[in-house]
């Protein structure tokens, strides 16, 4: 199969090819095979609009979905070549950052696998978020180029004009084929400008934020610490939705739509608030087609659905009207009319689209002018209904619904953990690959010692593979025979990497005092901090200082290791997750909408150590008290304390000598010798005088839960049982289930034509 492509491309055999030649040949093979698959088509089509799609490397995922992975692997192996080497050679697309983008990628996989006609719509970022480098124990940001001639991008001949205030631009469209597992294909549509100039980037990720023609799609989430950066974000968002809206209407017409019946031909899912301007833009385009304003607004409402991904007020975007007047003056009167319509109907400034400071509340517009509003975990949706969006819930109870997030098992089990996947197939059959709930069959083996022993062997092999990878890529030798305790996620105070760091200090001080743990402990972190998020970068600095401090300490380093993985991304997650023993899901209760890392860890046999937050609540319900470590205050307690406004972190600090010792250590002479005094002092003061995400109240319970997990780990037989229960109950968290629910209750798409 591959040999034929190699001969056609290079006139030689696989064994004679260089790595880049083989990669090009594999890319050609996959594009050819995917191109031969029928695309999902139907009268009604979904458009999943998102600012980010964290799709990860695509080579092996596509080979698996196309059903040719083993065949290609053997063909390469027979010629003395390694598919693993080619996987390492492939660049990872820089199109996303955290859970939002990874969820979107999982959803595209499931939409295609379920044979539903649905495409992603986003932007073709040249440098993505950034490539993270550590220098002097600090995060530094560098561009993260990924496009080359051997790219998954296929340039389309479609083009759309976008009118900004004062100038027009012509968008180009690139597609990435989305292969379904043993199914047909869909597309990820990515819009770009040919005029974007990568050479304007200098000194890390600095660039002229005002030259929109040259900078528009350079970076995901440009630094918003000043108005120029914030304005650029609005330019990006309007560019994305204007192109998307034009594409949607064009394709709907091609399928026979008269636009009055648009909702019968298109379903638009607004993924968080970044694509919100698609609502006024679609209304504007429908009015241009001769449809009256009120009817256009009704059509758009029946077509659009909104997914809320956050409980954090600062993440619900509110743009000054002056920004929209500058970027997209054509939609300003539309937004104003929508606001007048709402004000006349409800007479409540709390639900207005435009507030007293002349800011446009994107989430408010989404809720009023979408037919569905969903949260992404049971607890999250309940908090939206009862607290954060309660005013809207009283207006539109019928719109609110829950769709607990999910993950694609093709990537996070079949691809990331082939040892476990093969063992599961031998033990319970192959049905779980298409029907994840079939993993439940594994539960019947919980008392089978041979099965449990094999799970431990697989975990050990994956830990060795991770150790080898980190030695090769970062020069770090992980401790042998250790517990791997892992926290990998976007760096944010509410996710509370600072709590884990305080534990590392506590354990370091214990070992220094002669209290040696039964087994070595490796605390692994992976996280990027937004370039303008000062405290988040301070937390990374603290972790890197602890890493170095322990490396240098002969007494402690045999028993404790702190490691921050550089430039954490999907590829590194695929190495870390199968090797994990303890999954850190320690956000402040009520702040994490769902999380999906928790699901990936669970699927791969890690045991959750977490608060009752996001999807942790549902994991707890599924696995039971004995197979998860829950700690900390619940969401009701946290919400009540915020409402009272009486939290004082210093009270906890003064009353708990152990906590005080750990916090004070941040600014100790030892740490200041290793680190930046300004950064460490700023973080110390933030915790002592503010601690907005309540690290201190949960500290004692966190330490106790961690110690309990470490103690239980020593009973290997019982631990293997916990692993088995978690794996067997993970089927609920398949994104196939999530997408089926979206389709049954919101989109109402028919399966694509066979």
Describe the residue ranges of each PLM region.
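A conserved ligand/cofactor-binding region detector
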Residues: 1-754
């Amino acid at each position: 199969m591959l040999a034929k492509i190699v001969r056609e491309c290079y006139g030689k055999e696989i064994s004679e090819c260089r790595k880049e030649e083989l990669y090009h040949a594999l890319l050609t093979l996959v594009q050819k095979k995917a191109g031969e698959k029928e695309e999902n088509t139907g009268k009604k089509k979904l458009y999943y609009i998102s600012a980010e799609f964290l799709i990860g490397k695509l080579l092996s995922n596509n080979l698996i979905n196309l059903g040719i992975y083993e065949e290609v692997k053997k063909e390469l192996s027979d010629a003395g070549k390694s598919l693993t080497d080619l996987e390492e050679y492939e660049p990872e697309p820089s199109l996303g950052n955290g859970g939002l983008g990874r969820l979107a990628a999982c959803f595209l996989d499931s939409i295609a696998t379920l044979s539903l006609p649905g495409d992603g719509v986003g932007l073709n970022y040249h440098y993505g978020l950034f490539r993270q480098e550590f220098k002097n124990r600090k995060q530094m940001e560098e561009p993260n180029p990924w496009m080359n001639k051997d790219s998954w991008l296929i340039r389309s001949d479609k083009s759309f004009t976008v009118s900004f205030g004062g100038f027009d631009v012509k968008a180009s469209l690139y597609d990435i084929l989305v292969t379904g597992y043993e199914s047909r294909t869909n597309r990820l549509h990515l819009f770009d400008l040919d005029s974007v100039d990568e050479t304007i980037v200098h000194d890390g990720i600095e660039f002229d934020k005002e030259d929109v023609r040259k900078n528009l799609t350079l970076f995901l989430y440009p630094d918003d610490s000043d108005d120029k950066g914030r304005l650029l974000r609005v330019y990006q968002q309007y560019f994305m939705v204007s192109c998307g809206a034009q594409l949607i209407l064009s394709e709907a017409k091609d399928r026979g739509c008269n636009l009055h019946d648009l909702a019968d031909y298109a379903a638009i899912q607004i993924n968080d608030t970044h694509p919100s301007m698609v609502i006024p833009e679609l209304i504007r385009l429908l009015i241009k087609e001769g449809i009256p304003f009120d009817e256009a607004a009704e059509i758009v409402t029946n077509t659009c659905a909104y997914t809320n991904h956050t409980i954090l007020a600062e993440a619900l975007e509110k743009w000054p009207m002056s920004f929209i007047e500058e970027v997209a003056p054509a939609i300003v009167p539309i937004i104003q009319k929508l606001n007048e319509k709402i004000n006349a109907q409800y007479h409540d400034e709390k639900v207005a689209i435009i507030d007293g400071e002349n800011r446009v509340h994107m989430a408010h517009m989404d809720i009023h002018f979408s037919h569905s509003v969903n949260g992404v975990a049971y607890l999250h949706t309940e908090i939206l209904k009862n607290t954060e969006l309660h005013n809207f819930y009283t207006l539109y109870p019928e719109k609110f619904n829950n769709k607990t997030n999910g993950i694609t098992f093709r990537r996070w089990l079949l691809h990331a953990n082939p040892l476990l996947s093969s063992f599961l197939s031998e033990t319970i059959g192959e049905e779980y690959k298409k029907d994840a709930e079939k993993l439940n069959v594994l539960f019947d083996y919980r008392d089978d010692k041979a099965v449990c022993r094999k799970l431990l062997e697989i975990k050990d092999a994956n830990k060795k593979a991770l150790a080898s990878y980190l030695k090769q890529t970062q020069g770090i030798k992980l401790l042998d025979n250790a517990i791997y305790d892992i926290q990998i996620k976007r760096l944010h105070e509410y996710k509370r990497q600072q709590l884990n760091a305080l534990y590392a200090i506590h354990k370091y001080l214990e070992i220094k005092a002669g209290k040696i743990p039964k087994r070595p402990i490796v605390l692994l972190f992976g996280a990027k901090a937004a370039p303008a998020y000062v405290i988040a970068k301070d937390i990374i600095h603290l972790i890197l200082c602890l890493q170095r401090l322990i490396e240098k300490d002969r007494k402690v380093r045999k028993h404790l290791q702190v490691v921050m993985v550089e430039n954490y991304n999907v590829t590194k997650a695929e190495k870390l997750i199968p090797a994990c023993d303890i999954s850190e899901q320690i956000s402040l209760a009520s702040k994490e909408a769902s999380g999906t890392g928790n699901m990936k860890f669970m699927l791969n046999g890690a045991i959750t150590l977490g608060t009752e937050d996001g999807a942790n609540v549902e994991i707890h319900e599924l696995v039971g008290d004995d197979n998860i470590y829950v700690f900390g205050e619940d969401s009701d307690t946290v919400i009540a304390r915020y409402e009272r406004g009486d939290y004082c972190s210093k009270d906890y600090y003064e009353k708990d000598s152990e906590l005080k010792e750990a916090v004070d250590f941040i600014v100790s002479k030892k740490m200041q010798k290793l680190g930046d005094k300004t950064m460490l002092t700023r973080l110390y003061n933030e915790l002592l005088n503010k601690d907005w995400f309540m690290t201190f109240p949960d500290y004692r319970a966190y330490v106790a839960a961690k110690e309990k997990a470490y103690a239980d780990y020593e009973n290997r037989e019982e631990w293997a049982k916990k692993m088995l229960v978690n794996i067997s109950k993970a089927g609920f968290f398949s994104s196939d289930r999530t997408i089926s629910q979206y389709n049954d209750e919101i989109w109402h798409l028919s399966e694509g034509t066979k």
